[in-house]
Regions:
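Alpha-helical assembly-interface signal, strongest on the long, hydrophobic N-terminal helix that forms
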Residues: 1-73
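Short, conserved structural patches
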Residues: 2-3, 60, 64-147
């Protein structure tokens, strides 16, 4: 009698649907997580590209004020082109290089920060926004006039 009971308890009939249900549930939970990681990677890359483009635009400006405006506009356009939605975006430009005399090497540094929105993804524990920062430094033309 005991051996028959042990054999009955060891049977694996009917475990296929249970295993499938567990596997499908795990996959369904992993898909939004993979999408979230993909979005974060895209946002990080886009913010870095925006910082690069903004620094380049600032470095070809004639004045520090123009550099700030150009960097902000280019960063916003680059992020919009890449489809990155920022809850809060800031562009910081170090324009101290515009104070140097022509003939001396001067730099302009740009930092772009974007709080990318992630709240529409159904991932438990995922913050609704995540901050990404990109920084880039570009050389101002050495022999061009500055003000």
């Amino acid at each position: 009698m005991t051996s028959r009971l042990v054999a009955l308890l060891r049977r694996e009939d009917g475990f296929g649907p249970v295993e499938t249900a567990i596997a499908v549930t795990a996959v369904i939970l992993l898909i939004p997580l993979m999408i979230a990681f993909g979005r974060m990677a895209k946002a990080n890359t886009s913010v870095d590209a925006a910082a690069f483009m903004a620094a380049r635009a600032a470095s070809i400006s004639r004045t520090g004020g123009e550099a700030q405006g150009a960097a902000d506009a280019v960063a916003a356009a680059q992020l919009a082109q890449d489809g990155v939605s920022c809850a809060n975006r800031s562009v910081s430009v170090d324009t101290s290089g515009f104070g140097t005399e022509p003939g001396q090497t001067a730099l302009v540094a740009v930092s772009v920060t974007c709080r990318a929105e992630l709240g529409d993804l159904p991932v438990p524990g995922m913050p609704s926004t995540k901050a990404f920062t990109g920084q880039y430094t570009s050389v101002i033309d050495t022999y061009r006039g500055r003000s």
